[in-house]
Amino acid sequence: MGILFTRMFSSVFGNKEARILVLGLDNAGKTTILYRLQMGEVVSTIPTIGFNVETVQYNNIKFQVWDLGGQTSIRPYWRCYFPNTQAVIYVVDSSDTDRIGVAKEEFHAILEEDELKGAVVLIFANKQDLPGALDDAAVTEALELHKIKSRQWAIFKTCAVKGEGLFEGLDWLSNTLKSGSG
């Protein structure tokens, strides 16, 4: 009876839960973004070996956010977390122009995964505060986002340490998930 009431309450008042994966190469800023969204502050981070998972309540959606390590040796295990995922936040270090090609390859490999076919994609072009950072148009071109035809996606310029662009991206994500596109 309690579960039935909770579901009815959620459907009337628009509460929704969503499983979100935060993916990207190592040192892109994934963990900084997770804790900026969850706690509203920058925390000191170390490379993620495995994953961090936190709940972020935003705009009547309870996001269960999984931040997965981005090191080369960990990326093959990302697929273990794909089932039941409604959205992917792909974080790119916009200042790491040497690895933008690798970021593109990993991104397009994710898009090909059957278990993520229905997931919407939010791209954070992170580290906009650093010299030489590519803007969102350049990251769009580098990742070949124009090739994405079969799903909802958006890109936002972000600076995780300053909190810039993160909530604009979360607004887009929550609105997209609420509208049933995700």
UniProtKB/Swiss-Prot annotation:
GO terms for biological process: protein transport; vesicle-mediated transport. One of its GO terms (molecular function) is GTPase activity. Changing G2A: Loss of Golgi targeting. A lipid is attached at G2 (N-myristoyl glycine). CDD domains: Arl1. Keywords: ER-Golgi transport, Golgi apparatus, GTP-binding, Lipoprotein, Myristate, Nucleotide-binding, Protein transport, Transport. GTP-binding protein involved in protein trafficking; may modulate vesicle budding and uncoating within the Golgi apparatus. Belongs to the small GTPase superfamily. Arf family. This is ADP-ribosylation factor 3. It comes from Arabidopsis thaliana (Mouse-ear cress). The lineage of its organism: Eukaryota, Viridiplantae, Streptophyta, Embryophyta, Tracheophyta.
